[in-house]
């Protein structure tokens, strides 16, 4: 097998079986008042808080219509889900402002030596036409973490003022 170079890849976030899955690490960062978000080795956001700007993402809409928005987060080392966190998501004419992350569900230890992922449904958005859509996600308020286990220090030196976003899912709502 011989591959031609340069290799051509497609990094667009496309629909698969009615779901558009948009990894946080596929986005770019818009700096905030006190710095900017970075990405951790697992592709999650790092140091994402109200002062570090917003995450800019894109996806391809094949089927215009209404989509449910799910936001996936991962636990921050030995801290549990941050109760009371609020986010804002903007796309086109849709603004889901100051939405509470409620932990609608949890995927337990999906990767070896990892922490559980949680998801929160934050609302619905409508895309009236096909094509590339831009999405902006920002953190309005960080909730309160409770500790898990017995470690007193944060292994990566991050503050508790931080939410780890993994991905956004847009789920097409059939009529």
Model feature map: region roles:
Residues 1-175:
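Extracytoplasmic
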């Amino acid at each position: 097998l011989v591959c031609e170079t340069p290799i051509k890849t497609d990094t667009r976030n496309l629909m698969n079986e009615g779901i558009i899955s948009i990894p946080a690490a596929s986005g770019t960062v818009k700096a905030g008042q006190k710095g900017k978000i970075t990405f951790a080795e697992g592709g999650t956001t790092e140091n994402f808080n109200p002062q570090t700007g917003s995450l800019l993402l894109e996806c391809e809409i094949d089927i215009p219509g209404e989509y449910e928005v799910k936001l996936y987060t991962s636990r921050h080392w030995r801290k549990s889900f941050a109760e009371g966190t609020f986010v804002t998501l903007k796309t086109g004419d849709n603004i889901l402002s100051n939405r509470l992350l409620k932990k609608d569900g949890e995927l337990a230890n999906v990767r070896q030596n990892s922490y559980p992922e949680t998801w929160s449904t934050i609302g619905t958005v409508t895309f009236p036409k096909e094509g590339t859509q831009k999405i902006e996600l920002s953190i309005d308020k960080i909730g309160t973490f409770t500790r898990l286990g017995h470690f007193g220090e944060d292994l990566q030196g991050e503050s508790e003022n931080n939410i780890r976003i993994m991905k956004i899912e847009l789920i097409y709502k059939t009529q």
